[in-house]
Structure formats: C-alpha cells, structure tokens
C-alpha cells in the first residue's frame, strides 16, 4: 500500500523497502514516539514530550523563522524553506526541530500562533541549509506518518511575501479526484497517476483539519496539459486502493511571472489588517463558474463557512473557518485559471467591517498578487461565522450564471 516514503533522490541506493541511512536516526525516534500515541489525548502532547509553553498573549512574539534570510527569492533554486500544515496544538518549534533537525539539515522552525491567545494556528515553517535539502525532505516526508500522530505530514514550499513570490517553473494543470478511499495518501494518489502519465508533479489528498482524516477527494498536478485532459477521461472509474475514482477539471495555475508584483487598494486593505477576517474576494470570475466550482477549488485549503457568487456579477466571496486557511488559499490561488480565465484575489470585507466593498471593476484589468504581509508571516485568530452570511454580500444582484461541468456539488464522504 506504499507505506514507505519515497527514498531520498541524492542518497545512497537502496533496495525495495529499505530506509536511507541518513534517515535511520529519525525513524528510530519516530517509532518510539508512535508507541506513546495510544495514550495521547486529542490536543495534548504525548507522555514525556517536552513541550515549550505558549508565549504570553500580552507580549509580542519574537520572530524565529528566517524565511530564507537575505537570499534573492527570484530564483526557485534558492528557496530553502517549507510550509507545514495540519499541526496539532501541542506541536511546537521543539517538535519540528526534533523531527527535521536530527541530521543537522534543518536550521530553524517557526509555528504560527494567534496574536491574542498565543496558541498555534495549525501551521508553520521549517528552514533548511539549502534548497536541495529542503526538496529532499519535501519529497521524503510529505504524506508520510507524523510522529505521535494519526496524521500524515502536509508539506509544501513556503510562499514568500507580497511582491517576492518565487517564479514558477512552468504552468500547472490540475485534475480533481473524488470518491477516494479513506486510506489513500498523497503518495499513493501520486503514484497511481504517475504510473500512467510521466508529467505528474504531485498530488494532494484533502484532509479534515480537526480529525486529520481524508475528506475523500484531492487534486493531481500535471506539467503537460494534454496528459491532464487525457487523465480526466482515462482515469475516471479507475481504482486507487479499494474504490473507483471520479475525475474532473480543477483550476489550472499559470506561470507566476505573468502576475503584477503588487496591487495597492485605493481604499486601503482593511481586510488584510483585520485578524478576524477570513473572507477572500474573487474577481474576474468567468460566467461559467458556479459556487460549487469555487467550493471544489478553495475547499482544498481548509474548512469553508460560506461561498457566494452574487447574481449578475463576475466576482465572488469565499469565507473560511480560520484565517490561516484563507491566507494560504489567497497566496496559492491568486492568478490561477478557473473556467478559462485568471481569477484575481484580495481580502474581502469582514462581517464585522461595514465599510464599502471596493468596486469589482477595480479588479477587472489585472488585480495584483497578495501574498503574506510584507512584515512577515502574521498569526491570526478565528472568525466567528456571521448570523447571516449573505448580509455582507449585499449590493450585488442580477442575473445568474450558466452551468459549468466541473466537480461541482461534490459531497464530502462521511467517515
């Protein structure tokens, strides 16, 4: 069932099922941690784990994550930091450094915490000695079991600040995959498609942020558009693990070099500075795109509270359950293609913010890229869902949209 993570690309040659020698120390400690997990309660560290205390909410938290230091972020080969998600509340910098720092390859770790209460937001960053080391750890551990947890590692390249995002190596073409069996991992899904299509770049199974269990769907990324198109037909109904898959189109990512470096909102980006705001404004929405299409694309980054495309308007709003998910979605999806058109993302209006929403026309000609705030990777709180989610979508009324044949209306599996 492909339980072993892929071997390091530049390590010593190993036979089937063998572990690279430079990972032996880590895996031995992982086994020890896993034995403790049976006594672990949800949200608490395993017995004997030396957890660092959360910083006091009354004092500013010192930034520990280097984010690549003074390197020029324009070259993909120089990025040496990974984003890690789905962290449990007790997983702190000490945990990350014990996992990734045993070989001396990780130089720093940072868990993003809520400014008000000091508790983890569920994600963080790990900095490595160089790009090659970071890439090897990404390929080796992404999708592999996390020590002392039922969850798998969720890793990706760290996104840089606004105007500093690294250039992509090329366009990406994505296939939506539904009806996945509960045991399907990122690695298993990747290998299922890679056995047929050589241009597969990776796959992601979407997990519930609370339980860590699969939601029953995911996404597969291709470098070759023709293989993506073939896969949507040829892989539909094919088995991955114990169930036949259901495939369909998803958003395609264009090269990031085509995007403006920054966009300054003439009315001020109040949504970015509001720590309770979890709403993303989606501009330049194609007429064929439906709310279900937005759910399938934006839902891969976390739990959605509300999705709305106002009738007669070529824009939409996506509200997440927490700020961290919204930040990651805005960072990754801005400028990607949906329904044959590049969407433009910015922070929408918080339910508690009654200021006028910037006119959608401002976004029609090419709104720019909003990454993480220039001052660093901010920590944000959770936004309570509004009593009437449609209340702050007012002012957008008119006709409807056509029917777009995507994996819209996908029903999440009941575990």
UniProtKB/Swiss-Prot annotation:
What is the name listed in the Swiss-Prot or TrEMBL entry for this protein? Polyadenylate-binding protein RBP45C
Tell me the first and last residues of the signal peptide: none
* Location of the region described as Disordered in the Swiss-Prot/TrEMBL record: 1-77, 344-369
The task this protein performs is described as:
Heterogeneous nuclear ribonucleoprotein (hnRNP)-protein binding the poly(A) tail of mRNA and probably involved in some steps of pre-mRNA maturation.
Q: Which residues form the RRM domain?
A: 80-160, 173-252, 278-350
Natural source organism = Arabidopsis thaliana (Mouse-ear cress)
Q: Which Pfam families match?
A: RRM_1 (PF00076)
UniProt-recorded Gene Ontology molecular function terms: mRNA binding; poly(A) binding
Polar residues bias located where? 344-356
* Matches recorded under PANTHER family: POLYADENYLATE-BINDING PROTEIN RBP45C, TRNA SELENOCYSTEINE 1-ASSOCIATED PROTEIN 1-RELATED-RELATED
Describe the family membership recorded for this protein in Swiss-Prot or TrEMBL. Answer: Belongs to the polyadenylate-binding RBP45 family.
How it assembles, according to the record, is: Interacts with the poly(A) tail of mRNA in nucleus.
Q: Where is the composition biased (Low complexity)?
A: 23-64
Record bears the keyword Repeat: yes
């Amino acid at each position: 069932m492909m339980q072993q993570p892929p071997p390091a690309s530049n390590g010593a040659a190993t036979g089937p099922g063998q572990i690279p020698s430079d990972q032996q120390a880590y895996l031995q400690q992982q086994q020890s941690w896993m034995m403790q997990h049976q006594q672990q309660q949800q949200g608490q560290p395993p017995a004997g784990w030396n957890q660092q205390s959360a910083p006091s909410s009354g004092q500013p938290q010192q930034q520990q994550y280097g984010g690549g230091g003074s390197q020029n972020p324009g070259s993909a080969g120089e990025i040496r930091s990974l984003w890690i998600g789905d962290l449990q509340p007790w997983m702190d910098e000490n945990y990350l450094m014990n996992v990734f720092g045993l070989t001396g390859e990780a130089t720093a770790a940072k868990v993003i915490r809520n400014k008000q209460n000091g508790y983890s937001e569920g994600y963080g960053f790990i900095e490595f000695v160089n790009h090659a080391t970071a890439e090897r750890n990404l390929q080796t551990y992404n999708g592999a079991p996390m020590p002392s947890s039922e969850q798998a590692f969720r890793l990706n390249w760290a996104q840089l600040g606004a105007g500093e995002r690294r250039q992509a190596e090329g366009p990406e073409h994505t296939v939506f995959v539904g009806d996945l069996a509960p045991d399907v991992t990122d690695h298993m899904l990747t290998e299922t498609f890679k056995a047929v299509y050589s241009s597969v770049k990776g796959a992601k199974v979407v997990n519930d942020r609370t339980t860590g269990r699969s939601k029953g769907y995911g996404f597969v990324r291709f470098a070759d558009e023709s293989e993506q198109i073939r896969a949507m037909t040829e892989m539909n109904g094919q088995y991955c693990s114990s169930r036949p898959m259901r495939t369909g189109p998803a958003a395609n990512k264009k090269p990031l070099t085509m995007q403006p470096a920054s966009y300054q909102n003439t009315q001020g980006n109040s949504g970015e500075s509001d720590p309770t705001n979890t709403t993303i404004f989606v501009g330049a929405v194609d007429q064929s795109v439906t709310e279900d299409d937005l759910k399938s694309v934006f839902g891969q980054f976390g739990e959605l509270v509300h999705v709305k495309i106002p009738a007669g308007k070529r824009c939409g709003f996506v509200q997440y359950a927490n700020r961290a998910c919204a930040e990651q979605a805005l960072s990754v999806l801005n400028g990607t293609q949906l329904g044959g058109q590049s969407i433009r993302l910015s922070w929408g209006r918080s339910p508690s913010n009654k200021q006028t929403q910037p006119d959608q026309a401002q976004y029609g000609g090419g709104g720019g890229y909003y990454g993480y705030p220039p001052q660093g990777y901010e920590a944000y709180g959770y936004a309570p869902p509004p009593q009437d989610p449609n209340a702050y979508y007012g002012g957008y009324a008119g006709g409807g949209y056509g029917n777009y044949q995507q994996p819209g209306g996908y029903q999440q599996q009941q575990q």
